[in-house]
């Protein structure tokens, strides 16, 4: 095991979302569903977590390094090698929450397993 599985409470907390388009919007929706407050990088001093959702690999890496230097834990969409944490595929049947993760190795496999659990 190379990661510590945990559920992090973010209700009321600012979470940086860097990017534009659907990928960034999906991260912002995820933060909101968990009760967090998506914010721009200019408000990073209020945050502990950040999501980077940029298509350009160099821009994503630059943003991730900048946020890490500010002390934030960073997730970079589709670039697990740049991530401090990865996101599992989630089955939410409140109050039960099941998470399936491959540590970023195969999002497709994690989704497949989650769908089997939903059945």
Model regions: which residues?
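Short, ordered loop/turn segments at secondary-structure junctions
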Residues: 22, 78-82, 103-104
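Short glycine/serine/threonine-rich phosphate/pyrophosphate-binding segments
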Residues: 24-26, 59-60, 106-110
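Adenosine-phosphate binding glycine-rich loop
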Residues: 92-119
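ADP-ribose/adenylate-binding Rossmann-like module
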Residues: 49-54, 60-87
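Hydrophobic, well-ordered beta-alpha structural blocks that scaffold small-molecule cofactor pockets
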Residues: 1-45, 49
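Short beta-strand and adjoining strand-loop segment in the mid-core
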Residues: 16, 47-57, 96-104
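Glycine-rich phosphate/adenylate-binding loop
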Residues: 3, 7, 45-46, 74, ...
């Amino acid at each position: 095991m190379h990661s510590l599985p945990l559920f992090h409470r973010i209700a009321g907390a600012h979470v940086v979302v860097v990017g534009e388009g659907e990928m960034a919007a999906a991260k912002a929706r995820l933060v909101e569903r968990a009760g967090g407050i998506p914010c721009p990088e200019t408000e990073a001093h209020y945050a502990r977590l950040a999501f980077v959702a940029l298509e350009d690999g160099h821009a994503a890496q630059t943003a991730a390094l900048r946020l890490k230097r500010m002390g934030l834990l960073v997730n970079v969409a589709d670039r697990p090698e740049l991530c401090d944490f990865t996101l599992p595929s989630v089955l939410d049947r409140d109050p039960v929450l099941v998470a399936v993760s491959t540590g970023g190795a195969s999002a497709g496999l994690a989704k497949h397993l989650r769908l089997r659990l939903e059945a």
